[in-house]
Amino acid sequence: MYKEKYFEELKKEFNSEDEIVTEIVNLEAILNLPKGTEYFISDIHGEYDGLNHILKTGAGIIREKINDCFPEMNETEKNELNFTVAYPKYALEKRQLEQDAEELTQWYFGMITRMIGLTQFCASKYSRSKVRKSLPPKYAYIIEELLYVEGSPKNKQKYYEQIISKIIELDRAQDLIQSLAGTIQKMVIDHIHIVGDVFDRGRKSNQVLELLEHAHSLDFQWGNHDVLWLGGYAGSQACIATLFRIATRYGYIYDLEREYGINLRALFTFATQHYQANPAFYPKAGDFDQNNLDLLSQVHQALTIIQFKLEGQVIKRQPEFQMDDRLFLDEVQQGKIQLGDQEYPLENGCFQMVDADHPYELTKEEQEVIDSLSYSFRHSPKIKVHVNFILEKGSMYLIYNNNLLYHGCIPLTEDGDFDQFEYHGQKYAGKDLLTFFERHIRAGAAKKTSDEDDDTDLMWYCWIGKKSPLFGRTAMTTFERYFIADSATHKEGDNPYFKLRDRLSTAHYILRKFGLDERNSYIINGHTPVKVSEGESPIKGGGQIIVIDGGLSKAYQKSTGIAGYTLINNSYGFQIVTHMPFQGIDDLYESQTQSTSLKRIIDRDLPRRNIADTTIGTELKRQVDDLKYLLETDEISH
């Protein structure tokens, strides 16, 4: 019945057999075009400026295209074209200041000519229909004329030159250059994979999401920081307290108030009444005067204690999480704490709101604070839009073009088998474990009430739990970092996965269990910064696990030595991209240098991949089969 209805609906899209034949020819032709370029990036962490720069430059792809398209140009000319494509408005403003009218006219003519040539070069792997869709409507006709005149007989050269000259004469050169730049930026990246962690640490998560919402093709693999926000939206007060504590720690809590309309009044009033300024709780980032440093340290302490109380409540009502070793508030009144066989003194104490008899119970005022934050967060229109976007485009893992993408890890035992997580009498491991968590994340986010339940508790566990595929460590040592001086207690032990992923056998085991060809598939993994300064490589698993961490978070750039790795997969294979820290447009313009370097990482010769070999190709083949069936079995009425 469903199939019959499907074909009835399909018939309505066509008025004749000729239209079906045309569509079949079109789809089968598309299958033979080279596959589009995929771009993989992870761990953006609210760093809008760095991400925006990467996308504007195509992660170095645009410069490579310029090298291939214009081998005769010198490095200065290539750098100028590359910068103008990435930052056309800035480049145009600089030119206007530096050149007179005649020089500017010549520059416009040369730049438009080069940008048309580059656009044509980038468009050569796409159908005309797809190219047309990427053009700005107001200049679509003009750009198409210029694109398809290039390389034609000499008698059209004057026609070509006249179009450009007339655009300059009519004072539309700047507008056209900006339109061409946007078109090139769209063409060099066909699809974006965000391999987790858009939120936290950086202050511009909202701008990151708004930028990504305009991407023409994109997917997410959720990270633990993303699920923290999803959990907060679903009603987990432990998630709410944590994400606001992190915002205070990294100095962007005021940004949440401004951008998302969060009401902070109850929180700030409570914090100033019950906590004293404490330099140990000053924000790690941001430019604040002394009054604000002191105020934020009070807020930071209040949120920290509320978080530990709420986490304790989750741990106590979910014994299957096996996290009793993270219950510390029972002991804090003694001024020391027992970890394993050793006792440690506590420093920076701020436990005055902890009741020795009921350490995990919120006071009435604390409950009012967290209720206010939760209500404000869950009813923010912008947060609703961003959460729904991440849910719609996201998942715990993705199989795309025969590659496996996930953020954190696949929990393993020391022997290399899938580790099991037991919940309500059922055991989950490997692919089933990721599916289990995704089901509860979607259920938690879909419910209309703010009540905490198993779904919201499991979302919190995804953020912090020992067997969470998004976290992958034995413990999150937040308490130890705040209150114990001995740095040995701050270490977070890794799941065996992170050691075993160096082995080819581990890559093959995981790929096989996810139903993929272990010889020709790859794992793309985010979450952990690659410490280049210590000699670490992003290529693991015998070359079949590629670890990317966008490295955009400034908090990690000192330890990694770079601004991270991202990944490109075009029709020829994979290229890994090394990024240096982005210092701003002014610095880039003055230096006229590249902030990225690309390196092909598969040494063996591989056949060039067409769309027919991709996930999209599989869908197009299905459409062709359906149309052929329709053509053979039904007469289309006029």
Swiss-Prot record:
This is Fructose-1,6-bisphosphatase class 3. Belongs to the FBPase class 3 family. GO terms for molecular function: fructose 1,6-bisphosphate 1-phosphatase activity. Its cofactor is Mn(2+). Keywords: Carbohydrate metabolism, Hydrolase, Manganese. The lineage of its organism: Bacteria, Bacillati, Bacillota, Bacilli, Lactobacillales. It catalyses: beta-D-fructose 1,6-bisphosphate + H2O = beta-D-fructose 6-phosphate + phosphate. Gene3D superfamilies: 3.60.21.10. InterPro entries: FBPtase_class3, Metallo-depent_PP-like. The gene is fbp. Its EC number is 3.1.3.11. Pathway: Carbohydrate biosynthesis; gluconeogenesis. The keyword Manganese applies. One of its GO terms (biological process) is gluconeogenesis. It is an enzyme of class 3 (hydrolase).
